[in-house]
Amino acid sequence: MRRLTCARDQFYRVVACACLKESLQQDVSTAIQLRMTNSSDQSAVLLTTLGWSAFFDEQLEPGDAELVPMRIATVHRDRVTAMSELGPVRLKLSAQTNTTDFAVGDWVLVAREDRLLVRRLNRRMQLQRKTEGRRQAQLIAANVDALFIVTSCNEDFNPARLERYLALANEAGAVPVIVLTKIDQTPDPASYFKQAQALQLGLDVVMLNAKAPDAALTLARWCGPGQTVALVGSSGVGKSTLLNMLSEKSCANAQPTGSIRAGDAKGRHTTTSRSLHAIAGGGWVIDTPGVRTLHVSDVSAGLNTLFAEIVVLASHCRFRDCTHVHEPGCAVQAAAADGTL
């Protein structure tokens, strides 16, 4: 009887130890899973802050599990840097990599160990322009939400050039915003505002003095967490000053700003390459060098948006092939004559 009791007690002890061991294993497993989940959630939040979205997430494949998503911050002839969850990283490039295939704002997958750039994800949109002497269009930026078309309230203000930028933004699918700078240096900034607003239906136009304390609030709606804007415009219009204001850079880290010539108000180049910068409000801004001559091509959709009023009126012309110059029954000419266009 005593032997039976001892055997039974020993059996219970073994079962109890086994249950305790299993319980401990479950606790450890739960803790590890919780830790991994929290880490994953934190990673997702950081990627979203960088501009990551479902569009890029859907491009990931099972074999990409060991690769790290990063966002291109600068592109040079022989090197590429990217923004990661831990900050800026210089990427390792293979011998076959052509840096002209990449644009600031691109999302790429990078090997975790050696930081080798493995592949670029498809772009949600891209900004590009034609350059003289080149067959291939030049990439300006990628995966941009809004395009800040910067011009100053002086001799630089050029409606024809602004229209080309608007066509560029419309074609790419970016929200165009005309930013009128240096309003403190003109007696009549309202006249510039009126001219800019008339360029396109529903166009957002803002006026600001980039050095004013509340200047950033004027642009806040386009600069929230995860949003990306690009700055374009001529040299000397205040893009670098605007960049410093948006990123709240200290004097030591600020982008150099240039003066303008007194004779024609044309500026000197202070930005020499495209680059991605964090906005104080949580978004990102892509700075671009000043462009004095902008060529656009293959932007038919962008032009239709730019001249939406004319497109609508043209459908009411008497003749389908109306050139809107001399034909009778031209709705465009009639609208121009009575002041509605």
Language model regions located:
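N-terminal accessory targeting/assembly segments
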Residues: 9-12, 16-159
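Helix-rich effector regions associated with P-loop NTPase G domains
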Residues: 31-41, 63-66, 100-114, 120-146, ...
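Phosphate-binding glycine-rich loops and their immediate beta-loop-alpha structural context
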Residues: 140, 150-201
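Canonical P-loop GTPase G-domain recognition
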Residues: 185-235
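Conserved lysine of the Walker
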Residues: 239
